[in-house]
């Protein structure tokens, strides 16, 4: 347990460096550095990915061996949230190879790297907002709505910057049967797994809120008085 939280936070924080490199390069509009930033960012991404992987694995081992929860992974909402940056970073590592070899997917890589860091804030939102019931959740403290607004604005700005980076896509992608094609398919699969968790979680929450508004709040039961 002593290594589990630090490794997770080192993994989350480590993604900030390649994310800043990607966004800075896209905003600078320097064509000479279009491919160079991936060479600089890849070691940082791999290091952060490795630390996050170790943190997730140690957390599963600790839950099974020490807490006796009966499994390594309970599909807890906060546990799944820690997996989201790992999935996006894995997809980004695949698409970085395509940018280096084919001079394509510049905008995709910029957006994925930014989304990796933003997804770490999404995990914080789940823990601190009080919107989920989890053994990892804490009191909200009023940070849920501001943090959610920050996440939405960051996603919108990152998407706009990624559109600017698409101007450097001068190469051609190979067919689906090629190695690059399989890398793209793998990346799409990882992103689909990433999108599934927040979509299902928030849709289910909206449905519960609608049901509550339709039927009204449940009446509170009065405590029974003991016999005298």
Residue map of PLM features:
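Polytopic transmembrane helical bundles with strong interfacial aromatic enrichment
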Residues: 1-228
């Amino acid at each position: 347990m002593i290594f589990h939280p630090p490794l997770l936070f080192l993994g989350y924080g480590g993604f900030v460096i390649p994310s800043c490199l990607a966004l800075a390069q896209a905003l600078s509009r320097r064509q000479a550095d279009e491919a160079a930033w991936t060479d600089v960012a890849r070691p940082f991404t791999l290091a952060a990915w490795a630390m996050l992987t170790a943190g997730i694995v140690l957390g599963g081992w600790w839950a099974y061996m020490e807490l006796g929860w009966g499994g390594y992974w309970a599909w807890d909402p906060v546990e799944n949230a820690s997996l989201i940056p790992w999935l996006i970073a894995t997809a980004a590592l695949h698409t970085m190879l395509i940018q280096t070899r084919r001079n394509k997917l510049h905008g995709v890589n910029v957006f994925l790297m930014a989304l990796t860091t933003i997804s770490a804030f999404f995990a914080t939102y789940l823990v601190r907002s009080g919107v989920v019931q989890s053994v990892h959740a804490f009191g909200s403290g009023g940070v849920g709505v501001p943090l959610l607004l920050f996440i939405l604005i960051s996603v919108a700005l990152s998407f706009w910057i990624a559109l600017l980076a698409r101007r450097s896509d001068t190469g051609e992608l190979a067919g689906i049967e090629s190695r690059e094609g399989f890398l793209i398919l793998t990346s799409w699969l990882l992103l689909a797994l990433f999108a599934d968790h927040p979509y299902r979680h928030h849709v289910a929450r909206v449905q519960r809120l609608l049901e509550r508004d339709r039927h009204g709040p449940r009446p509170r039961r009065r405590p029974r008085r003991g016999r005298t």
